Amino acid sequence: MDIVAHTLWAAAGATVIHRRRPLSRSTVLVTLVLAALPDVIHLLPIASWWLFADGSFDALWAYAVAVPGQEPGVPPLVGSLSHHLHCVMHSAPIAGLFTLALWWVRRTFWIPLLGWWSHIVIDVFTHSADYYAVPVLYPFTERGFDGIAWITPWFMALNYTALAAVAVWLLMSRKRPDRG
């Protein structure tokens, strides 16, 4: 799924949670950042190549919006680092270990992790074998589930229609101050 949709779904989820358990603005903000982060962090090696070596912004942009098989050429190390960062950030075992470690330290579940978890779960089903299947069981395997590619036009329309419907529902169902 695209970064904007990930962030909007996380915002909807945070709104629902906030209605039952008040969340601070910083908690919501970190949740939204973690919902987008898996699709951003793997660009760091390419951005570093552009900023500190002989890469270009055009290559970074082309990589960010590439479709399978049309990625720009990058140095092997840069490509490998980017690939493995993508795998790490979309891995349920790694997110699970991180969640357990944080739970052990804090003795409670850290709500912003729901942003990361929502990203992983959504991406498992919204990427196809032909469109960057998500390696949800990395590092045990790099294979992914063959879902529906989020970039498929009818699916994008359905996704944003669903987001709009959820937004309307959230607005219509919010508690209004008693004016009586």
For each predicted feature, which ranges?
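N-terminal membrane-targeting hydrophobic helices
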Residues: 1-180
